[in-house]
């Protein structure tokens, strides 16, 4: 999920790859949305696109730290309604930002961004938390464009996955704050959980996500209503921030910026109440298992999964389920790493593992290089007719959608 505010990288970490350029992309279709994007590293490098978390958290330049600037062309973008994309879900009336804002719209934005930036061949797709959900959904939709999937803190966006973090013992809380009706993050962070549950009216605690959606259902009309809205949004984002790291005092997570909190919480809750817009029955279908139901679409993609053993935002069982499903589907190129860490990508072992993966990936041959390579081989072949048969359009074009 990752709706907690981004945190600066530790001072002893290498600087991010050099910034190249940024811009806004007019979203495809008849839409008001303009998608903000940035590039880092080398324009001649292997393209990698980063899917940020949340949904609604926005991108952060620190995400580029995992990539060798001589090797990679790193693309970050802010998903609809958040970060520097417009319109913003932080506005009092968030309706424009939340209109035409679904997972399918985000997938279409990635395709449009590829066109805008002239990424014509395959690319690496990198995502953590909700970013892993979007990365998987994109790869299911467009497997021919994906060279490698690199996933951290896997979130499958099933109802049980959401309830693990957001429901807990909320329904029983008023009668017994220490009730344990189901597994959940609340068991490990009781103080932070209490702060979160306290902002939800008791009558709405039977379904916390539904209660949050109710709180965000209309623009505030008075200062009091806006103050209440900010309080709920801040509690929602702070709860995730408190639970995101293994070695963080659950009481040490400060209050998020109001604009950030409104953006992140509104978009997050809209997606969660709609099952991440992944259900077969459309908006409102929270009981879906979309990713695992379509896992066969990913059987030919090399996939690296990194998950903290003590992740209490997205429990380890989600990564276990994904890896098992991939292997059962016949994907023999799955690498699975369990780190001594929580949810955050900034935890040292997780950070190191992600850097190592990116440094050790086999070099990717661009479509242009493949064409040049095939041309050289054709010129040196003893039998030109055989060479044409071996390196014809079908082979060269296999990396293109």
Show the residue positions of the predicted features.
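Catalytic active-site module of serine/aspartate enzymes centered on a nucleophile-bearing elbow/loop
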Residues: 329, 333-401
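Conserved HGGG/HGGXW glycine-rich cap/lid loop of the alpha/beta-hydrolase fold
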Residues: 28-91
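Conserved alpha/beta-hydrolase "acid-adjacent" motif
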Residues: 312-318
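N-terminal cap/lid segment of alpha/beta-hydrolase-fold proteins
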Residues: 10-34, 268
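Conserved hydrolase catalytic core segment
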Residues: 121-160
């Amino acid at each position: 999920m990752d709706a907690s505010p981004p945190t600066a990288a530790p001072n002893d970490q290498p600087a991010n790859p050099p910034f190249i350029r940024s811009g806004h992309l007019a979203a495809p279709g008849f839409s008001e949305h303009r998608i903000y994007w940035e590039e880092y590293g080398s324009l001649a490098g292997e393209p990698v696109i980063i899917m940020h978390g949340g949904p609604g958290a926005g991108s952060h330049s620190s995400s580029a730290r995992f990539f060798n600037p001589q090797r990679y062309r790193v693309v970050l973008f802010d998903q609809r309604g958040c970060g520097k994309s417009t319109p913003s879900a932080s506005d009092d009336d968030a309706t424009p930002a939340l209109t035409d804002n679904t997972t399918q719209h985000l997938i279409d934005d990635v395709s449009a961004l590829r066109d805008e930036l002239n990424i014509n061949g395959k690319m690496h797709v990198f995502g953590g938390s909700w970013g892993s959900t979007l990365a998987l959904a994109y790869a299911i939709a467009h497997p021919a464009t994906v060279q490698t999937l690199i996933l951290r803190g896997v979130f499958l966006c099933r109802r049980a996955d959401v309830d693990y973090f957001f429901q807990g013992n909320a329904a029983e809380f008023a009668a017994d704050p220490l009730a344990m009706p189901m597994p959940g993050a609340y068991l490990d962070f009781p103080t932070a959980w209490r702060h979160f549950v306290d902002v939800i009216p008791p009558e709405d605690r039977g379904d916390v996500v539904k209660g949050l959606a109710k709180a965000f259902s209309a623009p505030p009309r008075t200062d009091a209503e806006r103050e209440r809205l900010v309080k709920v949004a801040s509690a929602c984002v702070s709860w995730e921030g408190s639970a995101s790291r293994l070695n963080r005092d659950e009481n040490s997570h400060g209050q998020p910026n109001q604009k950030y909190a409104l953006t992140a919480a509104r978009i997050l809750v809209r997606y969660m109440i709609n099952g991440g817009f992944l259900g077969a029955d459309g908006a409102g279908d929270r009981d879906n298992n979309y990713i695992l139901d379509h896992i066969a679409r990913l059987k030919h993609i090399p996939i690296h999964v990194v998950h903290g053993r003590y992740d209490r935002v997205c429990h380890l069982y989600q990564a276990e389920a994904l890896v098992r499903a991939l292997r059962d589907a016949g994907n023999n190129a799955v690498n699975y790493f369990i780190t001594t860490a929580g949810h955050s990508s900034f935890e040292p072992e997780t950070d190191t593992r992600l850097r190592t993966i990116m440094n050790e990936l086999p070099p990717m041959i661009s479509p242009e290089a493949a064409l040049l390579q095939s041309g050289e081989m054709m010129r040196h072949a003893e039998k030109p007719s055989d060479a044409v048969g071996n390196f014809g359009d079908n082979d060269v074009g296999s990396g293109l959608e």
